[in-house]
């Protein structure tokens, strides 16, 4: 084995020289230089500085403007709530541990940080699944006369939390575990050991199949069908030009969110899968640290995409920031609000 396994940790460094110490008790400067830990801390500080205000603003603006409280926006707001969980439950912890060079909060703190990071990522993934299904049902119309309403949105939000908890909670109950990963300053699922006494192998397989592969299959199926339907409708001119444009723009926004999610999380999932399927292989701490910390940037991109591609929300945000007055005028926002009734969300 090219790493060192302890009772509640796995350090990707051989202990042949006797330098390996518990990541809960001693700085891990034998894994990387102190300046590299400082860089991680600076990165986490940047994510907190950007992630909190932009996600909080998304929630606040929606509360302030009734026109934004539409069913589909509930799912988008769910993403903002998940991101805030990651910021407060995960990023602040990782910032502090990176400054110290090891996970100073012990196994309990590791469980908390790992839980919130996993919960936030899974809520985001399952929210994108709900958005993909909504787009498929609204645009492809497999069920005639279906309208995505408030009850559907609430059920969709509840579904994302149930599925996310089904992934994030088991390690707290003894099925798998959360351990420090990479440079040992942040925590995640144990992909490094089989650990039969906690059935770790079965949980990792369950997680990859149920909470990664299946959501990806659903998302790609829905958007594959959607692309064909949009092209066919455009060719046959079955919808009005305004409706077609509105649906295309809403769909484009959601697709960009999916692509951004894949860019952030696929590297992490791929590295985790490689480590799990190559138990005991030789890999350095940076190998897992880079994709793990890159995945954390997902807390920023969803609200940014939403703000950039949604004129109605953008106008409401400007009105809120300018103390109730929009220097650009509110006509554009009103026009955008009435573009599409089917999707119940204003496109860009």
UniProtKB/Swiss-Prot annotation:
Q: Which residues lie on this side of the membrane: Cytoplasmic?
A: 62-73, 134-152, 225-252, 309-348
| Name used for this protein in its record | Rhodopsin
The family assignment reads: Belongs to the G-protein coupled receptor 1 family. Opsin subfamily.
Q: List the disulfide bonds.
A: 110-187
Question: Which residues of this chain are annotated as glycosylation sites?
Answer: 2, 15
Its post-translational modification remark reads: Phosphorylated on some or all of the serine and threonine residues present in the C-terminal region.
Per the UniProt entry, what species is this protein from, by scientific name?
Answer: Canis lupus familiaris (Dog)
The superkingdom of the source organism is Eukaryota
Residue numbers of Phosphothreonine PTMs: 340, 342
User: Which stretches are Extracellular in the membrane topology?
Assistant: 1-36, 97-110, 174-202, 275-286
PTM N6-(retinylidene)lysine: at which residues?
A: 296
How does the annotation summarize its subunit structure? Answer: Homodimer. May form a complex composed of RHO, GRK1 and RCVRN in a Ca(2+)-dependent manner; RCVRN prevents the interaction between GRK1 and RHO. Interacts with GRK1. Interacts (phosphorylated form) with SAG. Interacts with GNAT1. Interacts with GNAT3. SAG and G-proteins compete for a common binding site. Interacts with PRCD; the interaction promotes PRCD stability. Forms a complex with ASAP1 and ARF4. Forms a complex with ASAP1, RAB11A, Rabin8/RAB3IP, ARF4 and RAB11FIP3; the complex regulates Golgi-to-cilia rhodopsin/RHO transport in photoreceptors.
